[in-house]
Amino acid sequence: MRLNDTEIEQHLKDGIIGVEPAPQANNISGVTLDIHLGNDFRVLQDHAAPFIDISGSREAIEAAIQEVMSDEIVLKDDQAFFIHPGEFALAVTHESITLPADMVGWLDGRSSLARLGLMVHVTAHRIDPGWSGQIVLEFFNSGKLPLALRAGMKIGAISFEKLSGPCARPYNKREDAKYRDQHSAVASRISADGG
C-alpha cells in the first residue's frame, strides 16, 4: 500500500525514510514527495564511437562507455543545462534518499515537463528497498525546442510503497549493487552485470 502525505511525514519524522536535505512540508502532497534537480550532469559525446556492443565482454563494454560518456558536468547554481531535441543526458537529484528494507519508492516525472517533451526517467523509476543515495535521472528531450534546466528546480516526485515484509536481499546488502551510495550522475555500469 502506498503511503499518504501524513504517513510520509511521520516516516520522515521517525527516520524510517531518510531524505537529505530534509524536505519542506510544501514538498509533500497527496501520496508523493517532490524532488529537485541537482547540479551534476553527464552526456553522451557525439561521434565518439560508431556503436556500443552491450553484449560484448565486460572490458569492451566498459571501454566503450568510457569513450562515449562525458566527464561530469557540474553547474554553478545560476547556470542552466540545455538539453536539445533528441538529446539524452544523465543528471542527479538534489536530494539523497534512504529507504528501509520493507519499502520501495516510485519516481515519476512531472506532467508539466512531459508536456514540453522532457522525459525525466527513460525506464528506471523503481527505487529499491534498502536504497541509499542520490537518484540518477535519465533525461530525453522528445520535444521540438531546447529546454533549459537549472539546479533546484522541481523535477519529479517519489511515492513510497510499504511491502508485506522486509526483503531478504535489500539493495544496500547486495554484493552486486552497482550503484550503492551513488552521489553523482554515475554512468552506466552494465559491464558489471553478472552472467
UniProtKB/Swiss-Prot annotation:
Active-site residues (renumbered): 138 (proton donor/acceptor)
Q: What is its EC number?
A: 3.5.4.13
In terms of SUPFAM superfamilies, this protein maps to: dUTPase-like
Q: Which residues bind dCTP?
A: 110-115, 128, 136-138, 171, 178, 182
Do you know which InterPro entries this protein is assigned to?
dCTP_deaminase, dUTPase-like_sf, dUTPase_trimeric
- Biological or metabolic pathway of the protein: Pyrimidine metabolism; dUMP biosynthesis; dUMP from dCTP (dUTP route): step 1/2
Single GO BP term = dUTP biosynthetic process
Question: What does the record give as the reaction this protein catalyses?
Answer: dCTP + H2O + H(+) = dUTP + NH4(+)
Q: Which UniProt keywords apply?
A: Hydrolase, Nucleotide metabolism, Nucleotide-binding
Gene3D superfamilies documented for this protein: 2.70.40.10
Q: Which enzyme type, at the first EC level?
A: hydrolase
The domain of life is Bacteria
Q: Name one GO molecular function term.
A: nucleotide binding
Which family is annotated?
Belongs to the dCTP deaminase family.
Which NCBIfam families does this entry report, sorted A to Z?
Answer: dCTP_deam
HAMAP family noted in UniProt: dCTP_deaminase (MF_00146)
Oligomer status and interactors:
Homotrimer.
Task performed by this protein: Catalyzes the deamination of dCTP to dUTP.
Its recorded name reads: dCTP deaminase
The source organism is Idiomarina loihiensis (strain ATCC BAA-735 / DSM 15497 / L2-TR)
